């Protein structure tokens, strides 16, 4: 590539950075939680909703948390009557839309845990969105019910 071509490419990258940062600034992470499992487990899942209020689609290309050696984007799929998880290289969030990471669907797999967080512990969960980290606190709990919510069923 010529010097002029390199300069042109760098110029385009520099121009694109503020646009990517502006889109990422309009992305919100909501309702994050980590599933509590027995302390002997070395993996668990995390869930949240990613809301994109920008006019551009954004791409989630990774995730991290201090409690896990690695985090993978996964989706639970049904194939031939069997449920299986498939790793996703990225998840796209369309402009003006939201994507929910939920049990039985898209989720974050937290692998190589040093220790399972206890119910009530809050951990930092970060997503890589358009190349930049966006972090949120995630409460550890047993199920998807919001903290403090109890389902009272009468028979």
Name every feature range the model reports, one short phrase each.
Residues 6-9, 33:
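Short helix-onset patch at the extreme N-terminus, typifying the N->h transition
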Residues 1-5:
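N-terminal secretory signal peptides that target proteins for export/translocation
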Residues 26-155:
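Compact, glycine-rich, soluble single-domain proteins
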Residues 9-20:
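Bacterial N-terminal signal peptides
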